[in-house]
Amino acid sequence: MVVKIGIIKSGNIGTSPVLDLLLDERADRPNIDVRVFGSGAKMNPEQVEDVVPKVDQFDPDFCIFISPNPGAPGPAKARELLSEKDIPAIIIGDAPGKGKKDEMDEQGLGYIIVMSDPMIGAKREWLDPTEMAIFNADILKVLAETGALRLVQNTIDGVIDGAAAGNIELPKLIITAEKAVEAAGFENPYAKAKAIAAYEMAGAVANLDMKGCFMTKGFENFIPLVAAAHEMAASAAALADEAREIEKGNDSVLRTPHMKEGNTGCKTDLISKPE
């Protein structure tokens, strides 16, 4: 069976650019078919109301909606629209979504909340396209190297298996540092500690960016705050790199590629084949 997955992207978090790619990293997985629908950088209710219905034309077995802050007006509208459809749906969001998990339960929606996928320092006096890209690259590195993205991959793969078996169980997952590094499979305890530190640092970026973006007046006051937040993101990425380098030195980097049947393989030794 080929499982059809509809992905709706509205706005952007660090996980967004690679979400569909995590499920088919070499574009040769035979048991899934994915379509992505998006509203670009904007996530207002009017964009959401336009893009969410487009998933119906693909007739997916389940769909995923990913955006910042699942409680914001646009994503809240998306949740409302998805809860009314006869399609199992999963919401992927950042830390503010944790406060909406009871609502998502009531709406019959699954969720994956990536706690350390932080908001960006979105002030015109600071953020240009180059800075935006650098920030997202740093956060993506943290999420990949600490294991958070592998946990997203594994969780959605579980839903795919359920869909193929005719029994979808929607996830209810809050990705903490501990859960992320468990998925990463670190063998060296120092590498694991560095990865935990990197994940928690990335989570703290959001607090500083929120202070700079919403709680501080005067560009001379908020620019240092959002700049500091982005420096924290860069440092978190460097720390995550250090964790992976330790595992490389031990030849113990866990790799979990999708196999030719679509199932997940596993290997650690570099010069070996996944099983």
UniProtKB/Swiss-Prot annotation:
Pathway participation: One-carbon metabolism; methanogenesis from CO(2); 5,10-methylene-5,6,7,8-tetrahydromethanopterin from 5,10-methenyl-5,6,7,8-tetrahydromethanopterin (coenzyme F420 route): step 1/1
Catalytic activity: 5,10-methylenetetrahydromethanopterin + oxidized coenzyme F420-(gamma-L-Glu)(n) + 2 H(+) = 5,10-methenyl-5,6,7,8-tetrahydromethanopterin + reduced coenzyme F420-(gamma-L-Glu)(n)
Source domain of life: Archaea
Keyword Ribosomal protein: no
One family name in Pfam for this protein: MTD
InterPro entries (UniProt xref): MTD, MTD_sf
GO molecular function per UniProt: ferredoxin hydrogenase activity; methylenetetrahydromethanopterin dehydrogenase activity
Main enzyme class: oxidoreductase
Keyword flag Plastid: no
Keyword entries, A-Z: Methanogenesis, One-carbon metabolism, Oxidoreductase
E.C. designation(s): 1.5.98.1
Transmembrane segments annotated in the record for this chain: none
GO biological processes: methanogenesis, from carbon dioxide; one-carbon metabolic process
Family: Belongs to the MTD family.
Alphabetical list of HAMAP family matching this protein: MTD
Job of this protein: Catalyzes the reversible reduction of methenyl-H(4)MPT(+) to methylene-H(4)MPT.
Protein name: F420-dependent methylenetetrahydromethanopterin dehydrogenase
UniProt lineage: Archaea, Methanobacteriati, Methanobacteriota, Methanomada group, Methanobacteria
Gene responsible for this protein: mtd
